[in-house]
Amino acid sequence: MLSHPATSSVPAMTLADFTNPSLMIPHLRGQDAASVIQELSRILQREKRIPDLLPFYHAALNREYMVSTDMEAGMAFPHARLPGLKELSFALGRSDEPLAWGSKTPRSVRLVFLMAVPATDATQYLPLISGLARLGRDSRLVNRLQAATDSSQMLVALQQVELRTSAKPDLMT
């Protein structure tokens, strides 16, 4: 497990604390950034993590076209920061085949983390980004996520990355 020395008795948060199995798609249907962001936005709306599909989808897509969030580890981190979002959360999609991601210099991506970020909350956003970056540097966990065939396998891999923060969200409901 990627962890840090404990500084309090609060249980350690992991990447899994910001999502749940109903926010994961182990076999994405989308073939490009726009369709994958739409697919993941739909489950964020279905699970009531975002109030309206179109404003969130357009904000995430516009942000992605301005600056691509792809990483060498085969992951992308599109996101939108909007007012009215109640909690920081993300949807995770896994593509069976690599997707060309990025408008200027496309990279192959198989894992897409679409983050819904409240406009007023930067306190939990930074530890989440840091945890996702650490995940990208752990090839063993990236490989586990890329090989996952269901949401429970994806969740187990995310539980291996601990975050530095003291507030724990309750997204498993």
Predicted features by range, described:
Residues 1-173:
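Cytosolic covalent-transfer regions centered on His/Cys nucleophiles
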